[in-house]
Amino acid sequence: MPSRLRKTRKLRGHVSHGHGRIGKHRKHPGGRGNAGGMHHHRINFDKYHPGYFGKVGMRHYHLKRNQSFCPTVNLDKLWTLVSEQTRVNAAKNKTGVAPIIDVVRSGYYKVLGKGKLPKQPVIVKAKFFSRRAEEKIKGVGGACVLVA
């Protein structure tokens, strides 16, 4: 017959909670967690977790993990890296000095060529430029400056 209560609710008020008398349902008989993986739990670790212990291969000292780190930004997002005021001033005075956008200061290394640039010259500083990006920047009368 199904019961309305879970077993734990039924056992409320019974001191041992179904685990016998003194010290029968003991604390951590095999140790806590992964204890004894190389000793009393060896069979389990060998069977179900082969290769858990030990080392393989050689260590690479002074390994540079982020050699290929190169965050990119597209041309259509280029003007979002400078303030609104700079953008407005550059649009107003067409013959004046071209604004400088340093993408490295904004955390990007490479400029990619997706999107269109407004028809006003701009000087872009970056570590890398894609071919299309360089063509488009020079197409609006701007310049690409490589920085280390």
Swiss-Prot record:
The keyword Acetylation applies. The modification N6-acetyllysine is found at K47, K55, K110. One of its GO terms (cellular component) is cytosol. Keywords: Acetylation, Cytoplasm, Hydroxylation, Phosphoprotein, Ribonucleoprotein, Ribosomal protein. Gene3D superfamilies: 3.100.10.10, 4.10.990.10. Residues 1-30 have a biased composition (Basic residues). Hydroxylated on His-39 by MINA. PROSITE patterns: RIBOSOMAL_L15. Residues 1-37 are annotated as: Disordered. The modification Phosphoserine is found at S68. The keyword Cell division does not apply. It is found in: Cytoplasm. Its main location: cytoplasm. GO terms for molecular function: structural constituent of ribosome. InterPro entries: Rbsml_uL15_N, Ribosomal_uL15, Ribosomal_uL15/eL18, Ribosomal_uL15/eL18_sf, Ribosomal_uL15_CS. Belongs to the universal ribosomal protein uL15 family. Component of the large ribosomal subunit. The ribosome is a large ribonucleoprotein complex responsible for the synthesis of proteins in the cell. Component of the large ribosomal subunit. This is Large ribosomal subunit protein uL15. It comes from Mus musculus. The gene is Rpl27a.
